[in-house]
C-alpha cells in the first residue's frame, strides 16, 4: 500500500502512519472482538441502498480517518446528531444539478461552495482560483462521469480515478483517497458513507448496482 517513490516526503509519512495504525487496529480488535473486516479487504455494496453520511466534522464524537481502517469505536459517532442524509450534501446536490439537470458547473451549489471558500480563504482543496477549480477539478469530474457511464465503475486501486496532481486528494490526503469509498457500520449493522462522495454520487446517478468499499470503522455491537 506504500508508494516507495515518495519516501521521505510528508505524503509518505502520512501513508505509513495510516497503514501502521490500520494493522495495529486490526490486531488489537481481532484479539478483543474476534471477527472484524480485515485491513484493505474490499466489501461490495449497492450504493443506492446507503443514503446517509457519518459526519466527520471536528467534534468530540467524530470518526477520524487518519486513525486508520479496522477501527472499532464504542463512542456515539453513530448517534442521530452525527448522521446526515447523503442527498443533502453539496457534492450530491451539485453533481445532480450537473449531470441530471444539465446545469453549467457555475450554476451548481458545489461550484458556488468552492467559489465561496476560495474567495474567503484563498484556496479550496489546493485550488487557489475559481478558474483553476473550473478548468481542472470540474473537468476531471466530467471525465470521470463519462468514464463510468461508458465503461462501468472500476476499483480505485486499478488507478482509474487518478485525481489531478494539484488536488489535495493527490497530496495531503492521498493516503486514503487511493482507497475505495469509506463506510462505517453502526451498532445496528447499517452502513453509512464516510468519504469518497464524488465516486459514490456518480455511481448513484448512473444506477451502478455494486461498488467496492473499504470499512473505516465498526461499532462493537455490529460485530
What is each residue range found by the language model?
Residues 60-130:
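A basic- and aromatic-enriched beta-loop-alpha substructure that forms the phosphate/nucleotide-
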Residues 22-40, 49, 55-57, 71-93, ...:
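A short, basic-hydrophobic beta/loop patch
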Residues 1-21, 65, 72-82:
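Compositionally biased, charge-rich terminal segments
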Residues 4, 10, 22, 26-29, ...:
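Surface-exposed polar/charged interaction patches
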Residues 17, 24, 28, 51-54, ...:
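Generic detector of well-ordered alpha-helical segments enriched in charged/polar residues
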Amino acid at each position: 500500500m506504500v508508494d516507495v517513490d515518495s519516501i521521505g516526503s510528508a505524503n509518505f509519512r502520512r501513508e505509513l502512519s495510516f497503514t501502521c495504525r490500520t494493522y495495529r487496529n486490526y490486531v488489537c480488535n481481532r484479539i478483543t472482538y474476534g471477527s472484524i473486516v480485515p485491513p484493505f479487504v474490499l466489501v461490495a455494496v449497492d450504493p443506492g441502498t446507503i443514503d446517509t453520511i457519518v459526519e466527520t466534522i471536528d467534534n468530540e464524537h467524530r470518526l477520524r480517518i487518519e486513525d486508520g481502517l479496522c477501527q472499532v469505536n464504542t463512542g456515539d459517532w453513530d448517534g442521530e446528531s452525527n448522521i446526515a442524509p447523503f442527498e443533502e450534501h453539496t457534492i450530491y446536490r451539485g453533481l445532480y444539478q450537473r449531470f441530471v439537470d444539465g446545469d453549467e458547473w457555475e450554476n451548481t451549489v458545489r461550484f458556488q461552495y468552492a467559489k465561496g471558500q476560495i474567495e474567503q480563504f484563498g484556496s479550496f482543496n489546493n485550488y487557489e482560483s475559481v478558474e483553476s477549480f473550473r478548468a481542472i477539478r470540474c473537468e476531471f469530474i466530467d471525465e470521470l462521469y463519462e468514464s463510468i457511464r461508458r465503461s462501468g465503475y472500476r476499483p480505485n486501486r486499478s488507478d482509474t480515478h487518478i485525481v489531478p496532481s494539484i488536488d489535495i486528494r493527490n497530496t495531503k490526503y492521498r493516503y486514503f483517497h487511493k482507497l475505495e469509498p469509506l463506510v462505517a457500520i453502526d451498532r445496528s449493522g447499517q452502513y453509512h458513507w464516510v468519504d469518497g462522495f464524488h465516486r459514490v454520487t456518480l455511481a448513484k446517478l448512473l444506477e451502478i448496482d455494486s461498488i467496492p468499499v473499504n470499512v473505516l470503522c465498526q461499532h462493537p455491537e455490529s460485530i
